[in-house]
């Protein structure tokens, strides 16, 4: 579903993130694909905007400066691309190590307690690859 400021265009009382959101990332026509790789950033933005909407303050548009893909290709191989045109930066063992780090450290859910959950949602924690 298309989103603007993480708000579902067709149903403005709903905010979307991650696999459910096809979000504009800039004013150049780039969009975050409907993928779990954007869930942390989109989730933080959607949470902020849902709270802003409840408080009646302006929403912040979702922004994503860059786009990366790290695709697992089996037991010992992967490929890492950067940019909206997906230029290959790494492949093989080095990309596989990056993929393991992403899967085990970057996108791992926070521990089930309030302080860690709120810390995980901080804008400053989000990475512009």
Identify what each model region corresponds to.
Residues 35-64:
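Internal hydrophobic alpha-helix adjacent to the cofactor/substrate pocket in enzyme cavities
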Residues 11, 65-67:
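A structure-centric signal for secondary-structure junctions around beta-strands
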Residues 1-40:
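FAD-site-proximal beta/loop scaffold in flavoenzymes
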Residues 21-23, 30, 57, 63, ...:
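SDR active-site lid
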Residues 75-129:
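C-terminal auxiliary extensions adjacent to catalytic cores
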Residues 22, 47, 78:
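Short, electropositive, low-hydrophobicity segments enriched in small/polar residues
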